[in-house]
Amino acid sequence: MKVAFITAVYGGYERNPHPFIPQTIESDFIYFTDNPNVDSNGWIIDTNPYHDTHKSSLDNGLYINSMHKTGRLKELNNRHTFNICKYYKQNFQNIPRLKDYDIIIWLDGSVEIIREDVAEYMVELCGKYQIASWHNELRGGMLFHEAFSSYLSRYHDSKYLNQWQPYQDIINQYHHYLQEGYDENYWEKFPRVEGRGRGDHFGVWLTCFVAFNNKSPQIKKFLDLWYLQTLKYSTQDQVSFPKVVQDTNIVPYTLPDEKFSGNEPHTECSMFIKHEHFLK
């Protein structure tokens, strides 16, 4: 089995890749960036702009967060580096070098892996559940709380990090989801017993760590639908993730569990350290 841990950092959002613990099975750590001068800390540094050279077929140039608008709309392209990185997080199936991996594990640039058996366990979980992630201990399993906690400058500031971006209307996005049938009570009724994290948090996930079965056709559809939410609505992918879970009925195995502890993964868990972002 081939495993890749991937992240993307454009525009200096993080200073350098965090070091990692070598895994018990062969694993590559791949860092997509526009900065060839970062200290690699063992990561494979890839500066090819796949978001331009291997564009997502989903981006028709007519969405609020399209990167490839043409004609009069071209000046409204969302080329904010925060938006660019969503391509690598949500539509990485377009990247040629990743096609041969069986498991892809997305890490936000702030995440440092501190256990040697993460890849091995993700192979096991993704083989059975297709996706694995961590519960978000701050939201009580309610997407309402995630949406209404997103009044943050990285979504609402048109000059965030001194780069232009369109207003990311997350409250409008949440209301659209309700109109489309999103069910806040879905998770209480979901019958699976195992892989629910701490049950009262089940239903909203930390997308700073998500492992995917890269050989599954269903996961390719999941990722396409997830990225489409970014193009259409906002770059707040923790709001769109539960909606896509409901729409596809692919429900992640949710940590913590007996193998990896951490009821409050924002603060501490046995798998990774979540550092504060470096903002230049």
What is the predicted role of each segment?
Residues 88-154:
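GT-A fold catalytic core of metal-dependent nucleotide-sugar glycosyltransferases
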Residues 6, 31, 104-108, 130-135, ...:
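A structural signal for short, well-ordered beta-strand segments and their strand-loop junctions
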Residues 45-54, 59, 65-86, 91, ...:
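Core catalytic alpha/beta fold that binds nucleotide/phospho-ligands
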Residues 5, 29, 93, 110, ...:
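A residue-level signal for conserved active-site and pocket-lining positions in enzyme catalytic cores
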Residues 10-13, 35-37, 50-52, 76-77, ...:
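Short, solvent-exposed loop/turn segments at secondary-structure junctions
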Residues 1-85, 96-101, 230-236, 247-250, ...:
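N-terminal anchoring/stem segment of glycosyltransferases
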Residues 1, 25, 89, 107, ...:
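Residues that flank catalytic or metal-binding motifs in active/ligand-binding sites
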Residues 158-280:
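Catalytic core and acceptor-binding pocket of nucleotide-sugar-dependent glycosyltransferases
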